[in-house]
């Protein structure tokens, strides 16, 4: 009989004095009867969710990146990690256990249930600040829950959905508690939660509210030193758009088009409006070339104009991840389990800021090739993030600005806007329209403008950055990468020919696979690239070769890899 593994429903007690806010003490926890008994414990309960996020933060990296194109195991690697790399059975492999994601979901459900119980118990008699914060805490918990299910879906292809707070073992066969979902079902359930929120604490709470922790620390004017806390929760737009892009794989043409239209309109609007914040927030500009290492080489805020949700750690407070241990050849204990594969490095040009020549993502340390972007930088002779290597606990990004550009290009492609998609992927609007032309092409397709007005919002804020900022130079351009030679059609073609080309399935697939190839270059060691290939395989007739053709080069003998992928490319795990 299948049972869901039991997760202790205890929020870790977190210190509240300034920088001790995230201090954990595993021997001093709130038991079920005490949690939540007063307003201050609302915040402690929510930070219990963050503790679960810290536990899940590096899970996808070590589970999926060894199966993607970039990483290979070293002779030091544990046997279980080597087995993942060799595409042997994942069922029962310790790295493949989905426990961290279910623990997070349990924590979110429990927090929301206990918060509602507390609200009912005090009959809504709360301080003014609590009345403001409760909806934002619930909204944040909803997004953490959705992120947990999103990760389960993209890694395992299935999940058990439940909304109750688990206090004891329960049979997975109990359909009154659990609903087993495939990836389409996960997308549907998560999107419904993101769109409609939840009825809790006497009100309908949407899923897109943000908690401003700076004003919780200092209600009188905020405290900028704690601004990075606002990045603890993934953004609504990232989750909603990612899930929609996956859902299109399983929909009919009309429904898929509606989802692509949603992604295009909402991501484009979000990106354009974000430029108001500083001229280049979440954009692909020259600024990325200058600041790219700072997205990763950090233990705190990272490069804030690019980060859209992250997991933070603090060695002094015993909050640790395994990144440096697994990637660094000079780690002063057992470690250095994964390194860049030589064949993977061949896909980068010499100028590409992510390639081996530039030494911003990988480097030679202690005489060994190392994946170094999280903990070491050659810029300004800075070297390691800390003098004591074992103390380095890098920030793990959940989403960043690049994610939205890939989603936008993907959506424009499927809507037939091939010129826009190609421009976003390659060298951007600034190069497509030299001089920042004031009028975008008026071309239309099926009565819709191909170039949305949001690419030119107004004279001070747009993708050309005429007010002195940096304009859009594309995903490839912002990394000094190699442009993709994609199919196009002549301006002299007839309208009928242009229409047919726009919706040609082979053209759309060619553009999608170019995005996938660039995605592999961009998201190394972030627990994302393998799942992106799986998304494309699902989209195009469950074609395992989309994955296989991109990972096989690093293997001397790829026969086991092909056999495994042919059987199943989602990670296999049997819940008991």
Task: Outline where the language-model segments fall.
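Conserved, well-structured interaction surfaces
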Residues: 43-44, 78-157, 174-188, 196-203, ...
